[in-house]
Amino acid sequence: DTDRSRGLGDVYKRQVLHEPEIPANTGNIGRTCVATGTKLHLIEPLGFSLSEKHLKRAGMDYWKDLDVTVYENWEDFCKRNPGAKIYYATTKGRHVYSDVHYEPDCFIMFGKESAGIPEEILKANPDTCVRIPMIGETRSLNLSNSVAIVLYEALRQNDFDHMKLEGQLHRLSWDD
């Protein structure tokens, strides 16, 4: 079966952006979320307005289909998601992102472009801090690229269980 599309119900992978600053990154992440059936959670303050044209342009015509929730702050997020399993993607993490198991209902959180996730949050959750390996003194990867890397690993671990696995040619057939 190459089409695993089905209703996702109330839970599946959730991407959390903690105080994102750049609308184009958030727009690109929104498009990735739509393409993967993933919910997007935004923790304020945001460095832009959700109505900004750059945000919509990066998300293209997919933005209207995005399942997005906005929180007033970190405390609001925690209050509205009690007991949530959260993985914190950070350059400071001690675990490689591909070495952990992502549950279907987990959250994967990414920090703002200029500073990442606050260290107080990371220190309180050392076992669920994950990092993408890099060489040398590279500070970090682009936020939208990081989200895609970690999200697709989480989806792979769960057998892409709600995704279409095979594409079709537009003018020709693979079988000709």
Give short role names for the model-derived ranges.
Residues 39-45:
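Short internal beta-strands
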Residues 1-12:
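Single conserved hydrophobic/aromatic residue that forms the stacking wall/gate
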Residues 124-175:
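Structured adenosyl-cofactor binding patch, chiefly the S-adenosyl-L-methionine
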Residues 52-119:
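S-adenosyl-L-methionine/SAH cofactor-binding core of RNA-modifying enzymes
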Residues 32, 121:
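Hydrophobic/aromatic ligand-binding patch that stacks against planar heteroaromatic rings
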Residues 21-28, 141-145:
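Amphipathic alpha-helical repeat scaffolds
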Residues 7, 36, 82, 124-126:
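Short, structured coil segments at secondary-structure junctions
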